[in-house]
Amino acid sequence: MNLKETFHAFKESDNFFVSLARDIITVLLAVLIFASFSQVVFGMWTPMVAVESGSMEPHMNVGDIVFIQSIDRTQVVTYEEGMDNYNSFKNYGDVILYKPYGQEGVTPIIHRAMYYVEEGEQMWEGGPAAPHAGYITKGDNEMTNRYYDQQGQVSYMMPVKEEWVIGIARYRIPYIGYLRLMLPGF
């Protein structure tokens, strides 16, 4: 039997184990294609996160899947800079995904980059000097995020260093993230 005949027999077989192998190969190919596409377009193998809180409402909701573009592929546009002619998710500037305090293994925060401060510069009007350069960030939800992250528990007194930024939110798909939120550790 030549290769063409073997492939045809594999493709047409009704045997349970052959059918199972076919399904597994199909899923693996789909994952490989998606991962390759993600790497090319977004610069990341897994370019998405599920929104876990309402801090970005009404522009991102709990359960949304958000596609993230690697910070290596783009530059952050802050709210302050975006006021001229740029917005994302119905507001000025970029929404960034960052590691709080640069820590690994903690849930990343997805909030809007409001402006950039240099070391020693006031972090906000009447506020303390920045201990290092970085972004001042804030969630879009005015009910839950009245203050900058750096004024509260999210990133207290610490501007978000550029190396803490994982990427920039580019697209969202509503509700799909609930699947990920229902499966802890996934």
PLM features: what roles do these ranges have?
Residues 1-39:
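Secretory targeting signatures
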Residues 2-17, 46-49, 72, 84, ...:
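Extracytoplasmic/periplasmic terminal helices and flexible tails
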Residues 21-23, 30-130:
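Feature for secretory/organellar precursors and membrane-associated catalytic proteins
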